[in-house]
Amino acid sequence: MNESKSANISSNFDFFSVDRLIDNSVTDFDLFINLRDHFILYSGSGYKWSREELTHLFHAGHTSLFVRKQDMSKTMMYEAIAKLPTVRQDLSPSERIRAIEDLGAKFTQCLFEGEITEACTDKAKLIAQELTDCILEDRSCVLNLGDLAGHDFYTFYHSIRVSAYSVAVAVSLGLSDVQLLREIALGGILHDVGKRDVPVALLNKSGPLSEPEWSIVRSHPRVGHANIAQSILSHIPREIVLHHHERRSGLGYPDGLDHRSLLTEVQIVTLADIFDALTSARSYQKRRTRFEALDFIKHKLLKDDICPNAFRALVSCLTA
């Protein structure tokens, strides 16, 4: 191989140290070995690594593999996801929900700071599964969701709490299909993914938004829906991401859908979204108690904007 061709091939790849691979993890990018300037595929996307294979690579002298430069953002998300904490399954539901809440917040931070990859959506599905299983074991565990996060961390904690409240409401409504509950949980986790592209200064602005600023904020459902367009997700979480700001009256956004066109699952997440926003400290509002939030929803929103059955189910969850 001539020198210029070798340099050209090398310029398309970057080093990926084997010690960055984590036992029992799955890489969603191709990795190559370099044999005399020939880059040979070693592992394709979706490959699951074992401790034995990682040890074998080291013993064979392969301390580094190679990754296409175009996939570097995937490697960064892989490492961020792989370093997230695990949730101990021997904890009680009330303890486990707090651990899942912290895990969900850390995951959302990864989601907002990196590329949305296959590893990212796979992790969201696993968190949704853990959350659903925890709430099915004891629905009242949602009473232990924390209120410690101030507005600086609101965005990260908000999504996992919305997910938890949504599943609890769905269970209270009598929904028992575990896969459906996990889809609702997943939609809750991802519902605000479009806010990745909204300036933090707007999200945390203490004063009223100008019309152009409000237009940017209101764009996040469509942006989020576009962000997950290439992800392997079912219809329900996609609908939740796109339509969680719709209202039964038809006065919501982005499409002005009314109760005749909105999935029940979407309406559940809409209520959970509003409830958590009301009970959280924001830069522009003081946090309400749960009772104050329920009272506000009952007298200001229930008539036209909120699903009555979902509201009664939420009250049941919080007074169990």
Give residue spans per PLM region.
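Non-catalytic interface/linker regions that flank or bridge core catalytic/transmembrane domains
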Residues: 1-149, 153-154
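Short, charged helix-to-loop "capping" segments that act as catalytic/coupling loops
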Residues: 63, 170-181, 299-308
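Acidic/His-rich, divalent-metal-binding segments that scaffold phosphate/diphosphate chemistry
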Residues: 83-218, 225-236
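Alpha-helical scaffolding flanking metal-ion-dependent phosphate/phosphodiester catalytic sites
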Residues: 162, 183-198, 209-311, 320
